[in-house]
Amino acid sequence: MDFEFSEDQATLRDSLRRLVTHEYTLERRQAFLATPHGSSPRMWGLLAQQGVFSLGLPESVGGYGGPQEIMLVMEELGRGLVLEPFLSTVVLGGGLIRDHGTVAQRARLLPKIATGELRIVLAHFETGARYVLDHVSSIARRGRGSYVLTGSKVLVLDAPLADLLIVSARDDAAGGLSLFLVAPNTPGVTTTPYRTQDGRSAADVVLDEVRLPTAARLGSPGVALTALEQAVDCSFAALCAEAVGVIEALNEITLHHLNTRKLGQSGGRFQLMVLMATQAKSMSYLATSRCRARDRSERRRILSAAQAFVGKVARFVGQQAMQLHGGVGTSTEVAVSHYCKRLAMINASFGDSDHRVGAFGDLLRAES
């Protein structure tokens, strides 16, 4: 793998780090969390000015870059514990529209994502799914010139911030999964917002006889599972990169604490934290290099292994950082507790490290 960053990539990373360092002090982040939806419209606008919402999108709509640039952005957002829905909008939402949308849908929606005008969120997982992507009981009944959606979705991350939802449902006519573009204020849509462990916005979504025009269906009917798998795989890689950013920041905070308190006897434990962070970064790079591979089996195997390893490193580093800080580490007034909470949430996203180990084993057995 060649991960020597180009001048443009280094400039992107450095400018974003300066922005996050200046805008996302712990005090400001706490203030953002205290707002109704736990976000900063100003920060969203500043990220748009940086051009990061164009990453991975086609050049025809002003897009540039790809997985490697997204990795750099996710690392920096992780370092600052940035709350804005970059992953939901760019990696998941933008990826689904890019890969599965019609020409007209791509032309209409992708430019709005690129400028930050549109925040789009995937509403897919349901009760009892256990991270299985084709476990969908929501139904889309096709009528004359319309669809009627019925069902419910749980833990829809960033839903309270969304301008548009991408909702999955089983197409009664086509037989497979279809995706639908649904405005949150559509009659029959009910959202119940709440906060996750790390303070981020999420919601459960109920669809009660939601009537949509046929044009609201994203792409072709009944064949959305492949696009969902690809988008989620890219999200695996992006979350690995975010975890690396969180881990590196947590190590820096821990080193400062050890030096300030002159806790030299803990140096061995800290060196192990640094070593494991380096290994996690290597696995993040591997995930980034394979997240859009055409060979589905190879892609899923590598991404499962990468996420499992990074998740275990995240758990270890978080535990060690908390122990080395002592009781003060549990306080919401110090940064370490917020970094540890974010690592826990990343590890639980789309399947925790134990689930990914099982998935990796299943893939190996299937190939043997």
Give the label of every model feature segment.
Residues 84-104:
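N-terminal glycine-rich flavin-associated loop
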Residues 1-81, 100-103, 112, 116, ...:
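Alpha-helical interface subdomain recognition
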Residues 131, 135, 155-156, 183-221:
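Flexible, small-/acidic-enriched active-site or ligand-binding loops
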Residues 146, 150-189:
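A short core secondary-structure module
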Residues 99-101, 141, 167-170, 181-184, ...:
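Short beta-strand-to-turn element immediately C-terminal to the catalytic PLP-Schiff-base lysine
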Residues 132-150:
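Cytochrome P450 C-terminal beta-domain/meander region
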Residues 66, 132-134, 158-162:
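Short glycine/proline-enriched turns and hinge-like loops at secondary-structure junctions
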Residues 116-127:
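A short, Trp-centered hydrophobic/proline-enriched beta-strand micro-motif
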